[in-house]
Every structure is written in C-alpha cells, then in structure tokens.
UniProtKB/Swiss-Prot annotation:
GO terms for molecular function: rRNA binding; structural constituent of ribosome. NCBIfam families: L9. This is Large ribosomal subunit protein bL9. Binds to the 23S rRNA. InterPro entries: Ribosomal_bL9, Ribosomal_bL9/RNase_H1_N, Ribosomal_bL9_bac/chp, Ribosomal_bL9_C, Ribosomal_bL9_C_sf, Ribosomal_bL9_N, Ribosomal_bL9_N_sf. The keyword RNA-binding applies. GO terms for cellular component: cytosolic large ribosomal subunit. Keywords: Ribonucleoprotein, Ribosomal protein, RNA-binding, rRNA-binding. It comes from Fusobacterium nucleatum subsp. nucleatum (strain ATCC 25586 / DSM 15643 / BCRC 10681 / CIP 101130 / JCM 8532 / KCTC 2640 / LMG 13131 / VPI 4355). GO terms for biological process: translation. SUPFAM superfamilies: L9 N-domain-like, Ribosomal protein L9 C-domain. Belongs to the bacterial ribosomal protein bL9 family.
Length: 149
C-alpha cells in the first residue's frame, strides 16, 4: 500500500490537527481527506504556503506581544481612583468587580480591556493591586485606590 503526505485543513480524529502534515494510505487520502476537503496533498507549493502562514502568524503574535508590553507600561504607571459607597468601618457594600475596574480604566485612560482578563478581589477601602492578563506571558499589575464617596 502506498503512503502519501497530506496537509490537514481541519482537525481529523485519529490523524491530527489543522495544519499538520500526516502520512496516510493513498486510498484514505483520496477517498476521505481530499474528497471531503479535509486535506490537500503536501506538494512543495502547499508546504511553502504553510511556512508563509506560520511566519505571518509568528510576526502577528510578536506584534501583539509588543503592544501588550507597551500597554503594561502605561497601566503600571497609573493609579486608578475608584469611588464607592462604604460602611463606617471601611468595609464596602459588596466588592469591586472586574467590570467596574474595566469601566474605570476606559473612563480614565480611554482603553478597552476585557473584564475577563482582570483578576480583582477588592473588598476594602484603600490602596490595592489588580492583575490584568494582557497576553499569554504578559501580566500587568495596576495600583488601585478605593475611596469612599
């Protein structure tokens, strides 16, 4: 049985993930992968296309990482003042949520940050720190000052 190399265009159970080069029997390749548009023959042109796509993706990832590092510098250089209602002993009525912090960042700095990337657990008045995941390996720690209204 002849074996040929195929580049997968989508995830195929038992074979591999999208973009991988797999070696399969020619019958399986022609009757299932190629016919069902789940793969293409691994010709030099197709391999070059994949290589170019990977380079573009790596460049895009690096640009996003650099933007995240710049954003981290900006965020860490600022202190957010968040006015909230609080009881007599400095306890908040509830907690400050990531949504509130995201809206305060947008209001003060004009930056849109997804609330899901913000890790906040603030329940008292005074200074505190909030962690924001900007990229896979870039985290910003911003200073927050919670003040009573």
């Amino acid at each position: 049985m002849a074996k040929i190399q195929v580049i997968l265009l989508e995830d195929v159970a038992g074979q591999g993930r999208k973009g991988e080069i797999v070696t399969v029997s020619d019958g399986y390749a022609h009757n299932f992968l190629l016919k069902g548009k789940k793969g293409v023959l691994a010709t030099p042109e197709e391999l070059q296309k994949i290589e170019n796509r990977k380079k573009k993706e790596a460049k895009k990832q690096e640009e996003e990482r650099n933007k995240s590092l710049e954003l981290k510098k900006l965020l860490e250089s600022k202190v957010l003042d968040i006015p909230v209602k609080a009881g007599e002993n400095g306890k908040l009525f509830g907690a400050i949520t990531s949504k509130e912090i995201a809206s305060q960042i947008k209001e003060e700095l004009g930056l849109d940050i997804d609330k899901k990337k913000i890790e906040a657990n603030i329940k008292n008045l005074g200074p505190d720190e909030v962690h924001i995941k900007l990229f896979t390996d870039v985290k910003a720690v911003i200073k927050v000052n919670v003040i009573a209204k």
